[in-house]
Regions:
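Nucleic-acid endo/exonuclease domains
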Residues: 1-120
Length: 120
């Protein structure tokens, strides 16, 4: 990891942890913290800060608000996802609406991806 990026992004990550959205809090406290693996919130994977990261299986979990559906943001997300995949990460993206309306399915999907990565 590039230390200059990390030094700049760490304060941002700390701030984002304190200002989680309602959907991030719900997913974190009611699902991700209960998983049998360590999940990091607002993890620096330079040059980005990802919403959630499971290091044991290199799984990135991103929650997208409505701004992510604007062309500029969707292009940035595609570039970000490509970079993370080059680093060997799998990226799961869910909308805030997914968390609000399909919460159980989102949690099951995340759990299944973790289980799949633990399988030989």
């Amino acid at each position: 990891m590039n230390n200059s990026y990390s030094a700049k992004l760490t304060p941002l990550a700390n701030s984002l942890r304190k200002k989680m959205t309602k959907e991030e809090r719900h997913l974190w406290y009611d699902c991700l913290k209960l998983l049998p693996v360590t999940v990091h919130r607002q993890k620096v994977i330079a040059p980005y800060v990802v919403d959630f990261y499971v290091a044991s299986c290199k799984l990135v979990i991103e929650l997208d608000g409505s701004q992510h559906y604007e062309r500029k943001h969707s292009e940035e997300d595609a570039k970000r996802d490509a970079y993370l995949k080059k680093q060997g990460c799998e990226v799961l993206r869910y909308s805030n609406a997914d968390v609000n309306l399909r919460y159980r399915q989102v949690c099951e999907d995340i759990y299944n991806h973790i289980q799949k990565s633990d399988s030989p």
